[in-house]
């Protein structure tokens, strides 16, 4: 909902030569964005116009969540290098606290917003915002459960298996502002004497 969130959009069509520069998304991440939803091309070592080496150029300390429909960015079994999902989450001290990325192809339908990867992405957002499921792992599972009735359609079955979560599945999106508990005042005998 736009009345509750600041939404930043990066569309190729809005840039000279229909190509926004990678520094745009890097600046968004460095400025503390909470969520990124990516619909675009990827590979094992490339997503959101960034190559895995670019993850080391990030300086953010407020980590984000990324959901990408791109191909292969979550291919953790790639033989030649760690996939970019791993670089966003565990290979650097910056980037994302969690990502959902495809181990293989992202599946779309030309001229439609009902592609197979988009169905899982939409159901993920429905789980978080519509069904009130704040845990990132439960929301990912729910997106898969909600697509079971059409498991035989096109490439739904493939996306079911390949849309993988990198990160702690028990992490929750904020439902309210977190405040740390009060530090307990521990009183007792000094120096271990009773």
Describe the residue ranges of each PLM region.
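Proline-centered linker/hinge motifs at extracellular inter-domain junctions
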Residues: 178-185, 189
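Cysteine-dependent hydrolase recognition
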Residues: 1-180
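Structural beta-strand segments of beta-rich domains
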Residues: 192-194
